[in-house]
């Protein structure tokens, strides 16, 4: 994922897009009866550089728009093309301010920065250190204890959506786990979600545009899924909450899937103009039959944990109140089983399928690359990243 540039206040425009609208009423956060001076405005621009916490793409777009309105007035630039995601988002944000006077835009910019500075300082003091922040920015958390490698999707504020960097980090974590002395490898999620799947802003962050993102995405996805196909040790998913997209389709490559009764399983590929991945076009019909697989992969039916169990996607469902205790007690028992015996048994179970799975993965990635460049997919992604936030 491309990093956001923080070195200059006027560059508060996202390389990643999520929500592009912020009600103007929320901008009058400070001194409504006062007029910000030019010096106040310049001080605010300098203050932006010192923010310790990323305020999110929604706010960064608003800062960009207010800066442009305060310095140049209403937007008169031609509207960028539909495929120019970043510049179109910037244009939309600026144009949405209409005829807002320069003085008002300047005041709103100063007030918004002041509010962000206060929030950032309070957040830093509340956390009492940088450890939590470092874990949050890492994307995944990998721990090894008692014979278990635990890989946690660790972006709870983003519902554990998976970035390009997280794909690479998971590949590395699995390669390390395949050769270390742990016995089983477990995936779970931090917070309320297991994972909301692929971070769609992966497609809007590539500097070379959609084609570069599609090419990179196909390569990374192919290696990512192959790593799961080839993983030699028992692989267990502890699905603590809603799972979406690739976090669901991957489950067909796991050896056991334990779910909380509050978990749901959703593969909205058609809604996004995309197609199945992670070998689900093969594993899902094999597990649940063609009709039930089509309900999920074609029509985007969301399954409850009980429904997923009935269709063979989930091994066992546990009550939310006892989920963590029951599952981890069981996993600690599994980790004491003879490791070589489990490796050999898994190889016997999976070996006849490996060649087929690699072929399916190759075909799915090739198809997905084409879908990502299709008008249907691009329109769906644009609709997603420009949607209004839920109140």
Curated annotation (Swiss-Prot):
CDD domains tied to this protein: crotonase-like (cd06558)
Positions where Phosphoserine occurs in the chain: 99, 117
Record site: Important for catalytic activity: 277
Segments for region (ECH-like): 149-319
Domain ACB: 37-122
GO cellular component, one term: peroxisome
EC number: 5.3.3.8
Pathway where this protein functions: Lipid metabolism; fatty acid beta-oxidation
Assigned keywords, A-Z: Acetylation, Isomerase, Mitochondrion, Peroxisome, Phosphoprotein, Transit peptide
Molecular function via GO: delta(3)-delta(2)-enoyl-CoA isomerase activity; fatty-acyl-CoA binding; intramolecular oxidoreductase activity, transposing C=C bonds
Residue interval(s) of motif Microbody targeting signal: 389-391
Cell compartment(s), UniProt: Peroxisome matrix; Mitochondrion
Residue numbers carrying N6-succinyllysine: 49, 53, 60, 68, 79, 88, 90, 127, 159, 286
Predominant location: other
Catalytic activity as recorded in UniProt: a (3Z)-enoyl-CoA = a 4-saturated (2E)-enoyl-CoA; a (3E)-enoyl-CoA = a 4-saturated (2E)-enoyl-CoA; (2E)-tetradecenoyl-CoA = (3Z)-tetradecenoyl-CoA; (3E)-tetradecenoyl-CoA = (2E)-tetradecenoyl-CoA
Transit peptide endpoints, chain numbering: 1-36
Biological processes annotated in GO: fatty acid beta-oxidation
Tissue-wise expression: Liver (at protein level).
Chain residues that bind substrate: 196-200
Its biological purpose: Able to isomerize both 3-cis and 3-trans double bonds into the 2-trans form in a range of enoyl-CoA species. Has a preference for 3-trans substrates.
Similarity remark: In the C-terminal section; belongs to the enoyl-CoA hydratase/isomerase family.
UniProt protein name: Enoyl-CoA delta isomerase 2
Protein's gene: Eci2
């Amino acid at each position: 994922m491309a990093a956001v540039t923080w070195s200059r206040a006027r560059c508060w425009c996202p390389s990643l897009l999520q929500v592009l609208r912020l009600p103007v009423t929320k901008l009058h956060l400070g001194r409504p009866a006062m007029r910000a001076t030019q010096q106040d405005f310049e001080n605010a621009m300098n203050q932006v550089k010192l923010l310790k916490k990323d305020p999110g793409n929604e706010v960064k777009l608003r800062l960009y728009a207010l800066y442009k309105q305060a310095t140049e007035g209403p937007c008169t630039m031609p509207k960028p093309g539909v495929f120019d995601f970043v510049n179109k988002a910037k244009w939309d944000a600026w144009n949405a301010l209409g005829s807002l006077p320069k003085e008002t835009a300047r005041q709103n910019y100063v007030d918004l920065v002041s509010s962000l500075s206060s929030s950032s300082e309070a957040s830093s003091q509340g956390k009492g250190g940088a450890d939590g922040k470092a874990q949050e920015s890492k994307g995944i958390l990998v721990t090894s204890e008692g014979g278990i490698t635990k890989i946690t999707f660790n972006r709870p504020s983003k519902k554990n959506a998976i970035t390009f960097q997280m794909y690479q980090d998971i590949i590395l974590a699995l390669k390390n786990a395949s050769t270390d002395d742990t016995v089983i490898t477990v995936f779970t999620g931090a917070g309320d979600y297991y994972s909301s799947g692929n971070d769609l802003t992966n497609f809007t962050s590539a500097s070379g545009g959609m084609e570069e993102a599609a090419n990179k995405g196909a390569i990374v996805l192919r290696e990512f899924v192959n790593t799961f196909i080839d993983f030699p040790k028992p692989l267990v998913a502890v699905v603590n909450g809603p799972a979406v997209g690739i976090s669901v389709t991957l489950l067909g490559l796991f050896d056991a899937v334990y779910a909380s009764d509050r978990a749901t399983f959703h593969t909205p590929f058609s809604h996004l103009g995309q197609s199945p991945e992670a070998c689900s076009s093969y594993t899902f019909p094999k597990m649940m039959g063609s009709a039930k697989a089509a309900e999920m992969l074609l029509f985007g039916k969301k399954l409850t944990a009980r429904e997923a169990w009935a269709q063979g996607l989930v091994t066992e469902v546990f009550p939310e109140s006892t989920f963590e205790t029951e599952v981890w007690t069981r996993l600690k028992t599994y980790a004491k089983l003879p490791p070589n015996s489990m490796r050999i048994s898994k190889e016997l179970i999976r070996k006849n399928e490996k060649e087929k799975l690699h072929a399916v993965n190759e075909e799915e990635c090739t198809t997905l690359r084409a879908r990502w460049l299709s008008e249907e997919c691009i329109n769906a992604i644009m609709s997603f990243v420009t949607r209004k936030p839920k109140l």
